[in-house]
Amino acid sequence: MSDFLWVEKYRPKKISDCILTEDLKNTFSKFLTQKEIPNLLLSGTAGTGKTTVARALCEELGADYIIINGSDEGRHIDTLRTTIKNFASSVSLDGGSNHKVVIVDEADYMNADSVQPALRNFIETFYKNCRFIFTCNFKNKIIPALHSRCTVIDFRITNGQKVKTATAFLKRLGEILKSENIEYDNRVVAELIQRHYPDFRR
């Protein structure tokens, strides 16, 4: 048995490998072609690939990045200020991108009266050297000042897109199970996907 959780072991490293709708994949592919990303607010239910996409963008662009969990260290404004300031204000030596990236995961858990306004200031202060990618389940919990400074991308999957994305995940999960030498019943796996859809982590 591997020591790694499958969600990490098999996390896609490229946008082309992420299970996304065609519109989303095209949007993120354009950023890669331009070799530039704006500040982003990725919104959608849990397990739809927001953090995976954020990491894949950074990896493919060759950008130095850090991940801050908004439900953990992101709740403490002093820690947040120190972490982001130290990272964003330094010049990247190894990265291939023009900008560093701060990924703020679960940003909707951050205090809307103190922490989120501070992030707005960081976006403006470090714009020349750094970009921010925020992920959230509920974009209505993100203050308007952050909305207006980001390109907002909705990961919501419509009923018309459900079959295609669920089928793609069924295929991916089958490949994972085979690589782990685990026997499985395709119908059972399909039922599990249907039960937890669109949360691909469960």
Protein language model regions, located:
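P-loop/Walker A NTP-binding region and its immediately flanking N-terminal helices
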Residues: 1-161, 167-168, 187-191
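Helix-loop-helix "sensor" segment of P-loop NTPases
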Residues: 166-189
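Alpha-solenoid HEAT/Armadillo repeat architecture
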Residues: 178, 193-197
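The conserved phosphate-sensing helix
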Residues: 184-186, 196-202
